[in-house]
Swiss-Prot record:
The D1/D2 heterodimer binds P680, chlorophylls that are the primary electron donor of PSII, and subsequent electron acceptors. It shares a non-heme iron and each subunit binds pheophytin, quinone, additional chlorophylls, carotenoids and lipids. There is also a Cl(-1) ion associated with D1 and D2, which is required for oxygen evolution. The PSII complex binds additional chlorophylls, carotenoids and specific lipids. Photosystem II (PSII) is a light-driven water:plastoquinone oxidoreductase that uses light energy to abstract electrons from H(2)O, generating O(2) and a proton gradient subsequently used for ATP formation. It consists of a core antenna complex that captures photons, and an electron transfer chain that converts photonic excitation into a charge separation. The D1/D2 (PsbA/PsbD) reaction center heterodimer binds P680, the primary electron donor of PSII as well as several subsequent electron acceptors. D2 is needed for assembly of a stable PSII complex. Fe cation binds at residues 215, 269. Its main location: plastid. Belongs to the reaction center PufL/M/PsbA/D family. The gene is psbD. PROSITE patterns: REACTION_CENTER (PS00244). This is Photosystem II D2 protein. Chlorophyll a ChlzD2 binds at residue 118. It comes from Carica papaya (Papaya).
Length: 353
């Protein structure tokens, strides 16, 4: 058996090398291979959202006004989901629904699928950008791993949930008030606030906010070296080797406050990474469960007792009645094509109605 030893030489003008050199060149805004996915998708998603909220009505899909042109403001404008009758169609501009007619495509809700899909790939491109840059400067990829949390939430809410339902119609529209309405829908139809995955998500997000506040305050509290500049931004160089705050002092302070404290910075910062990312992932898993119509906690014994005993009521049974009211109102409004009719006596009444 003969083994040939030698150096493999590539053509210096290889197209891949030329592309790689240009894409990863050191410039003010890094492009990279990930930029081929990120920049076009982000441009189209943001541009589609601005176009929809400025000009496009939701009259044909939801019976609503949803654009600045119709009198909405920033909080009430939205890019609305397609009609329920269009199910899970990708609503391509050249597809059988719009047949290349841009106006009809907008009327049918084509901008929603356009923004949702380009937005999802844009977020993935941003995560890949963090991977690529981390690899280039020999960092660990934890930034990209952390960003997987928001991606998981976006994909589960805007794509997986409506895929589990009858159509894109049941996804959130892209607007502030529209997403508020979607949250009310989630509560009324899925009792989302009593879902353990939602509870873990809330604990993760609020816990992360608490950790950030404590961490920032502690670092500021334990500063021991002042610079000559007028403020913090001018006084210290970001490339300085020495630290200007005391981990030992911070450790002693929190040991006295709680009885326990983080013993080193690695564990502290890993915990600050772990809490919010795990919370977001748990929320995403919960929404995937809702796509399959899995139920939250049901305390049936309390419901039965409340039905039998007029004097027995809990916060849980009151919330169940509230959910029934939400369903009774929203189903008839949001799904007029179903011809849902509720007798007057079962509809909730209050001071505002």
């Amino acid at each position: 058996m003969t083994i040939a030893l030698g150096k493999f030489t590539k053509d210096e003008n290889d197209l891949f090398d030329i592309m790689d050199d240009w894409l990863r060149r050191d410039r003010f805004v890094f492009v990279g291979w990930s930029g081929l996915l990120l920049f076009p998708c982000a441009y189209f998603a943001i541009g589609g959202w601005f176009t929809g909220t400025t000009f496009v009505t939701s009259w044909y899909t939801h019976g609503l006004a949803s654009s600045y042109l119709e009198g909405c403001n920033f909080l009430t404008a939205a890019v609305s989901t397609p009609a329920n009758s269009l199910a899970h169609s990708l609503l391509l501009l050249w597809g059988p629904e719009a047949q290349g007619d841009f106006t009809r495509w907008c009327q049918l809700g084509g901008l929603w699928t356009f923004v949702a899909l380009h937005g999802a790939f844009g977020l993935i491109g941003f995560m890949l950008r963090q991977f690529e840059l981390a690899r280039s400067v020999q960092l660990r990829p934890y930034n990209a791993i952390a960003f997987s949390g928001p991606i998981a939430v976006f994909v589960s809410v805007f794509l997986i949930y409506p895929l589990g339902q009858s159509g894109w119609f049941f996804a959130p529209s892209f607007g502030v008030a529209a997403i508020f309405r979607f949250i009310l829908f989630f509560q009324g139809f899925h009792n989302w606030t009593l879902n353990p995955f939602h509870m873990m998500g809330v604990a993760g997000v609020l816990g992360a906010a608490l950790l950030c506040a404590i961490h920032g305050a502690t670092v500021e509290n334990t500063l021991f070296e002042d610079g000559d500049g007028a403020n913090t931004f001018r006084a210290f160089n970001p490339t300085q080797a020495e630290e200007t705050y005391s981990m030992v002092t911070a450790n002693r302070f929190w040991s006295q406050i709680f009885g326990v404290a983080f013993s080193n910075k690695r564990w502290l910062h890993f915990f600050m990474l772990f809490v919010p990312v795990t919370g977001l992932w748990m929320s995403a898993l919960g929404v995937v469960g809702l796509a399959l119509n899995l139920r939250a906690y049901d305390f049936v014994s309390q419901e039965i007792r409340a039905a039998e005993d007029p004097e027995f009521e809990t916060f849980y049974t009151k919330n169940i009645l509230l959910n029934e009211g939400i369903r009774a109102w929203m189903a008839a409004q949001d799904q007029p094509h179903e011809n849902l009719i509720f007798p007057e006596e079962v509809l909730p009444r209050g001071n505002a109605l």
